[in-house]
Amino acid sequence: MQTDPSDLRGRSKSIMKHPDQWRDTVDPFTLPFRSFRPLEILGYPHAGNDVFYVKGLHNGTAVNAYIKVARQRGADVSNEIAVLSQLHSAITPAVLDFCLEGTPFLVTQELTGERLSTIAGENRHLESLSYLAEYGAALAGIHQMKIQAAPVKDRKFFHAPADASLGALNLEHLRGLFPAPMTDTDRCFCHGDLHYGNILWADHHVSGILDFELSGYGNREFDIAWALFRRPGQKFLLTEEEVQEFLKGYRQLGTCDAETVKAYMAQCYVYFLLVCTTDAAYCAYVRAWLDAFARERGRK
């Protein structure tokens, strides 16, 4: 990690705000805790699993924490526990309690900070630019780690979109422009899901890196692309200037093939087009981005 844990001491605290209950969940008070006892639910973060922001007691000491309960298919709480136990960093969550029997769950201590989406707001003046180099360097720091971990689990996003999908989207001109299938050569430790929602900021520095459930040894360029491509509603990383600032920060600690990164970004954008059909503004942005990508590759 680029941020030295000692740099975080004395920084002002900023607490994340989370929504009220937005779907049916398990009752976290019925979970078989060992060293943690929840006292009050403070919020329900949006996530694939059931996640609760709570006030509670850890070995008798008052703490704020997050309880993650496996819900979605493919959830791997045990992988996250194994990885977090090796990191020992002030900017990664400390494990307070867990259980892998029955319905697996994990309790981690809260880290202070805000998401860049909150800090940058509408990002009218590219306020994001002053954060993106450290964002890129933080991911490069993860890629330098040498820890015990399994290969990342296969995901559809790793594979070139099917010709039928490209045809349905009228994107046939993109055929053949995606990276070759991933191999086991030159793998590095990858976060697996580092996007703006999983990184916190305080006093203009990274204060937290969250959600290591999908982490493991995998493809460096895909992990970078996953961090870079724009999600629906996101107001930053819309411009080439922002992307280059991120990559500039990444190159402070690591190297990458920028052309392959861009091809993986295109791959991810196609998959998001398939599911984000009702967000007209996002779809228009993605199609314009993909058209520019195709022109760069001499296809349009």
Where are the model-predicted features located?
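Juxta-kinase regulatory segment immediately upstream of eukaryotic protein kinase catalytic domains
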Residues: 2-40
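An alpha-helical support segment within catalytic cores of ATP-dependent transferases
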Residues: 20-33, 144-192, 196-204, 286, ...
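ATP-binding pocket architecture of kinase catalytic cores
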Residues: 41-150
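Protein kinase-like catalytic core scaffold
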Residues: 65, 91, 106, 188, ...
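Conserved protein kinase catalytic core
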Residues: 74, 115, 199, 217-219
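Short, glycine/acidic-enriched loop or turn micro-motifs at the edges of active sites
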Residues: 112, 194-196, 214, 226
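Active-site Asp-x-Gly
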Residues: 187-189, 202-244
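Helix-rich C-terminal or lid/interface subdomains of diverse kinases
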Residues: 226-231, 235-300
